[in-house]
């Protein structure tokens, strides 16, 4: 498991504070929490190291029946013990990679995502403690790795797939990332890549090197309109 190197605390704090301020401007809070009983949450984990921001990803265990080997964020279905979307994301992250709640600061909730037409996924964005060391649960997680946040605006290897839903075209972003330390190649796509691009757009406030279906001048409202349209067509 590769991990980015550290940086002086004042620099790290400034980097994190700037990112937090931008994320909070895009926070939808609990605005859509009432919409479905079939609820899921994912934790979108950020880490500041070496003067840069990174996203942490997991590779699903080959033992899993659904999507084995896929790259994703920690997360899963809400349990009766979960009080809210954040509780689900934190519980799943602890089960999957050994992340305790005190090791992450939750900053914002992004616009939900309609997954497989019958599940409502809430992205919960948080900053990891800079000393956090992942301890993957082998039954659920095969690997943990980090990717620089700016890779999701200026990638080295990238392609798109076109998806059509009810007459509307959408872009699936596909990123191939080679870990510089291990040489392992990862494919990041689907909902996971969509969220990574959105977080990069919010925090870095830069135009990407590829076509997107977000409105850069009206980012969160445009995401909300797309979500509500998809929700209206779903089984939720």
UniProtKB/Swiss-Prot annotation:
Outcome of swapping residue 96 to A: Loss of fatty acyl-coenzyme A diphosphatase activity
Q: How is its activity regulated?
A: Inhibited by fluoride.
N6-succinyllysine PTM positions read: 20, 178
Where in the chain is the site Important for coenzyme A binding? Answer: 66
Q: What's an example Gene Ontology biological process for this entry?
A: butyryl-CoA catabolic process
Reported effect of changing residue 95 to A?
Answer: No significant effect on Km for CoA
- Place the motif Microbody targeting signal on the sequence: 234-236
Report the GO terms under cellular component. peroxisomal matrix; peroxisome
The record's pH note reads:
Optimum pH is 8.
Describe the effect of residue 79 to A. Answer: No significant effect on Km for CoA
* InterPro entries per the UniProt record, alphabetical: CoAse, NUDIX_hydrolase-like_dom_sf, NUDIX_hydrolase_dom, NUDIX_hydrolase_NudL_CS
Which reaction is catalysed here? hexanoyl-CoA + H2O = hexanoyl-4'-phosphopantetheine + adenosine 3',5'-bisphosphate + 2 H(+); octanoyl-CoA + H2O = S-octanoyl-4'-phosphopantetheine + adenosine 3',5'-bisphosphate + 2 H(+); butanoyl-CoA + H2O = S-butanoyl-4'-phosphopantetheine + adenosine 3',5'-bisphosphate + 2 H(+); decanoyl-CoA + H2O = decanoyl-4'-phosphopantetheine + adenosine 3',5'-bisphosphate + 2 H(+)
Q: Which CDD domains match?
A: NUDIX_CoAse_Nudt7
Effect noted on mutating residue 66 to M: No significant effect on Km for CoA
Q: Which GO terms describe its molecular function?
A: coenzyme A diphosphatase activity; magnesium ion binding; manganese ion binding; snoRNA binding
Q: Which cysteine pairs are covalently linked by disulfides here?
A: none
Q: Which UniProt keywords apply?
A: Hydrolase, Magnesium, Manganese, Metal-binding, Peroxisome, RNA-binding
Q: What is the effect of changing residue 66 to A?
A: 10-fold increase in Km for CoA
Q: Which cofactor does it need?
A: Mn(2+); Mg(2+)
- Motif Nudix box located where? 77-98
Question: What range(s) does the Nudix hydrolase domain occupy?
Answer: 37-169
* Residues binding Mg(2+), per UniProt: 92, 96
Task: Spell out the family assignment given in the record's similarity comment.
Answer: Belongs to the Nudix hydrolase family. PCD1 subfamily.
Q: What does this protein's UniProt record list under function?
A: Fatty acyl-coenzyme A (CoA) diphosphatase that hydrolyzes fatty acyl-CoA to yield acyl-4'-phosphopantetheine and adenosine 3',5'-bisphosphate. Cleaves CoA, CoA esters and oxidized CoA with similar efficiencies. Preferentially hydrolyzes medium-chain acyl-CoAs and bile acid-CoAs. Has no activity toward NDP-sugars, CDP-alcohols, (deoxy)nucleoside 5'-triphosphates, nucleoside 5'-di or monophosphates, diadenosine polyphosphates, NAD, NADH, NADP, NADPH or thymidine-5'-monophospho-p-nitrophenyl ester.
Protein name, entry field:
Peroxisomal coenzyme A diphosphatase NUDT7
Q: Native species of this protein?
A: Mus musculus (Mouse)
């Amino acid at each position: 498991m590769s991990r980015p190197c550290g940086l002086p605390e004042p620099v790290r704090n400034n980097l994190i504070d700037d990112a937090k301020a931008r994320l909070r401007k895009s926070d939808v809070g609990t605005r859509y929490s009432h919409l479905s009983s079939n609820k899921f949450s994912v934790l979108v984990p950020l880490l500041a190291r070496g003067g840069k921001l990174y996203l942490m990803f997991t590779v699903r265990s080959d033992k899993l029946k659904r999507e084995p080997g896929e790259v994703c964020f920690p997360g899963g279905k809400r349990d009766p013990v979960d009080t809210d979307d954040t509780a689900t994301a934190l519980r799943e992250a602890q089960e999957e990679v050994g992340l305790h709640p005190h090791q992450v600061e939750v900053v914002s909730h992004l616009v939900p995502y309609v997954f497989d037409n019958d599940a409502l996924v809430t992205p919960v964005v948080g900053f990891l403690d800079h000393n956090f060391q992942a301890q993957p649960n082998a039954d659920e997680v095969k690997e943990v790795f980090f990717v620089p946040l700016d890779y999701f605006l200026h990638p080295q290897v990238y392609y798109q797939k076109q998806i059509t839903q009810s007459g509307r075209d959408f872009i699936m972003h596909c990123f191939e990332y080679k870990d510089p330390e291990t040489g392992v190649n990862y494919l990041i796509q689907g909902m996971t890549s969509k969220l990574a691009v959105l977080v990069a757009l919010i925090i870095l406030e830069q135009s990407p090197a590829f076509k997107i279906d977000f409105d850069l001048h009206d980012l969160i409202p445009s995401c909300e309109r797309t979500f509500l349209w998809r929700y209206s067509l779903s089984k939720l």
